[in-house]
Amino acid sequence: MNFIKVFIVALVFALPFSACSNYGKVLKSKDSDYKLSMADQYYQAGKYREAQQLYEELYPVFKGTDKFEELYYKDAYCFYYLKQYKDAENFFKGFLEVFPNSSRSEEVDYMHALCFYKQVDKVDLDQTNTTKSIGVMQTFINQHPGSPKIKEANEIIDKNRAQLEAKELRAADLYFKIGQYRAAAICYNALLSDYPESASGDEYKLKSLISYYKFAKLSQYSKQIERYEKVVTEYQDFAERYPQSTHLSEALEYNNLSLKKIKEIENE
């Protein structure tokens, strides 16, 4: 039994060294067709780093031949599967430039766009890649209106837009939290403008209204009437846009408080 255990352990440790040894032999080989065949085998086995190294070594050998397109195609996917999305993005783009009439062009164009999505950062970080992702995915939709990937592309755009919306909301909420009420109100209204179909539209409008109310309350006495009137205007817009909103009664309270304040100031 002990002998069997020792043998198994030795075998487990020996396999990686054997694989490394075989890969080393492939790298040293002078036979380009053999190297390409082995690169394809590594690719099929999911050993993308090994496949990639071989593919890139073979670029000058097969460039201009009928084997170059598939080599380039698989090399781009190696970067993607290794999660090196920036490099994959560049290689998929390069493929489209080198093989504009390829039967794979639609697929590769989608993968190029998908790489932008894969580089999107979390909501609390910079959203430059999110904006880029929306742009390139929309371009894909425009250029391939009949693609089976259209639904998936639209879903990615929706996710990206939701992330941008969440980022803007955080900024507005932060302004509100630190007492910068006018800036908060402007940001909440910007959310309505940027995302008119948002399910949270009435919440943004209510927060804008409340922000303007707090801004008016903290304003110089000489400017309060004008700023309470802004709250009333915001309420009228709220009631017109969202007559069935569950937040309507709360918005009405701030409207009535503002009207009361205006009357008090005018009567002094």
Sequence positions of predicted segments:
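Bacterial N-terminal signal peptides
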Residues: 8-16
